[in-house]
Amino acid sequence: MKSNLENFNFQTSIREQVVPSRKKVILPAWLEVAKPRLIPLLLATTLGGMALTEEWPLSSPKLICTLGGGALAAAAAGALNCLWEMDLDKRMKRTSNRALPSGKLSFNTVFLGAVSCTFAAAMLLISGVNYLAAGLTLLGLCSYVILYTIILKPRTTQNIVFGGVAGAIPPLVGASAATGHVGLSGWWLFGLVMLWTPAHFWALAILLKDDYASVGIPMLPSVKGSAFTVKAISRYGWATVFMSILGVFALPEGGLLYVIMLLPFNGRLLQLINRLKSSPDDLEKAKGLFRWSILYMFGICLLLLISRTQLSVDFEQQSMQIFLSLKAYFNI
């Protein structure tokens, strides 16, 4: 009995540390419903989509309008998600103190705010960017609220696999903002985010599987268990690594430096996945993988931006010159 109690306390403490800022930083109620912690990564992948185009860097006004519109749309999506799941949040201890279930904000107030943010995002993107970027942004919003939150999340363990399309749309927005269309490079980053999402989210779901099970949400770890989930994480992790390497062909230039700098990111991701495979119920290892997966995607986007600098281009040219010199020297 004592060991079970100690194990419960350990798991509870780990769950409370997954996103420690929820404990340490009290957000204003109106900001909390916008889920601001999710927005920076969405904007990072938007920048990544831009960096894959020949038109990078964009003019400052277009860049600001794209990122501003994306942030407003993401805030609207977060608020609408909170509205739909308000009753669900009331039943979960972890979420019962959120702004809506606790009564800090009313349904009408949040709904009005979400509609206002959606309208502002559309106007900003239409006037400052183009119709395609605006349409894709609204498609991402609807995908998150309707496809994932309403349709898939309460019905299938594969909810995040197909619902992950919402989080993968920002690279398409970035590419379309830069060029007016979505090329193959933009679709590459879309695919990378789609493959990365299950491994990223299921690591978090392992930590919260009891919470999801208590309210009947069929997250994969809650239904199939941690061991089964970690095997799925491993498959998606390897697919993510393979897809990330293909980025060398997606970049207009600077791909050599990208693929070299990519190695430690992929190595660390696979290392953490293998550690979790050895102990699927180890919440510390699940937490470590979840946190690194966030840094991983930020890192990928940063590498894409670095690869478009003159330094990266010069490195690639000098490397090619060295290769050709060695080839001539050895008569290859």
UniProtKB/Swiss-Prot annotation:
Pfam families: UbiA (PF01040)
Biological pathway: Porphyrin-containing compound metabolism; heme O biosynthesis; heme O from protoheme: step 1/1
Keywords: Cell inner membrane, Cell membrane, Heme biosynthesis, Membrane, Transferase, Transmembrane, Transmembrane helix
EC number: 2.5.1.141
GO terms, molecular function: protoheme IX farnesyltransferase activity
Protein family: Belongs to the UbiA prenyltransferase family. Protoheme IX farnesyltransferase subfamily.
Gene behind this protein: ctaB
Gene Ontology CC: plasma membrane
InterPro entries: Protohaem_IX_farnesylTrfase (IPR006369), UbiA_prenyltransferase (IPR000537), UbiA_prenylTrfase_CS (IPR030470), UbiA_sf (IPR044878)
Lineage: Bacteria, Bacillati, Cyanobacteriota, Cyanophyceae, Synechococcales
Name the UniProt record assigns to this protein: Protoheme IX farnesyltransferase
Origin species: Prochlorococcus marinus (strain MIT 9515)
